């Protein structure tokens, strides 16, 4: 059998919650708002599948450059190139200075 090439491949531990984090996420994560230019961390919540960024961006930090619907558009550097990542607020954390 050949290996799969799906979007969630190689994510056995990346998309796994610890025992204390299990269950649904709080509503406050869904209604948090970010401003343009704000730096945010991508922290994927596996209990929310809609609006999930590609798992290869787990742990990346990016700048909010806009909003499309309820999702935010982030500018993320991957190597020498800048990528645009779309994500709902459940998968984002504000950066603390």
Swiss-Prot record:
GO terms (BP aspect): translation
Gene3D superfamilies noted in UniProt: Ribosomal protein L21
PROSITE patterns in UniProt: RIBOSOMAL_L21E (PS01171)
InterPro entries to which the protein is assigned, alphabetical: Ribosomal_eL21 (IPR001147), Ribosomal_eL21_arc (IPR022856), Ribosomal_eL21_CS (IPR018259), Ribosomal_eL21_sf (IPR036948), Translation_prot_SH3-like_sf (IPR008991)
One cellular component (GO) term of this entry: ribosome
Molecular function terms from GO: structural constituent of ribosome
Pfam family of the protein (one): Ribosomal_L21e
Keywords: Ribonucleoprotein, Ribosomal protein
NCBIfam families for this protein: PRK04306.1
Assigned protein family: Belongs to the eukaryotic ribosomal protein eL21 family.
Protein name: Large ribosomal subunit protein eL21
Organism this protein belongs to: Methanosarcina mazei (strain ATCC BAA-159 / DSM 3647 / Goe1 / Go1 / JCM 11833 / OCM 88)
Name of the gene encoding the protein in the UniProt record: rpl21e
């Amino acid at each position: 059998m050949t290996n799969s090439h799906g979007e969630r491949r190689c994510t056995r531990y990346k998309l796994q919650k610890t025992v204390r984090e299990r269950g649904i996420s709080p509503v406050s994560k869904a209604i948090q708002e970010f401003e343009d230019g704000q730096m945010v961390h991508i922290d994927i919540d596996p209990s929310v599948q809609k609006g999930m960024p590609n798992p290869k961006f787990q742990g990346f930090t990016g700048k909010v450059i806009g909003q499309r619907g309820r999702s935010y558009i982030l500018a993320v550097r991957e190597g020498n190139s800048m990528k645009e990542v779309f994500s709902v607020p459940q998968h984002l954390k504000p950066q603390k200075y």
